[in-house]
């Protein structure tokens, strides 16, 4: 039986990608994230589907573009009902 690899997705709000001590930030100390990065994958050039956090998280969790998921903010009256969610896809893959 194939063993699934461990996946840890950290989603932060209002987080600068350079605010990490392992990314040589002069003041910020992030020892736990440093430890994770040493044994994992760090995407130094990752890009977001949209520039604001709510539609970007919706795109990440549903696999749909902002145009397709319709999410703009919390008060946009768009239902949070989509065909697929990342958690569901992980579950379907044995996680």
Locations of the language-model features?
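Formylglycine-dependent sulfatase
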Residues: 1-95
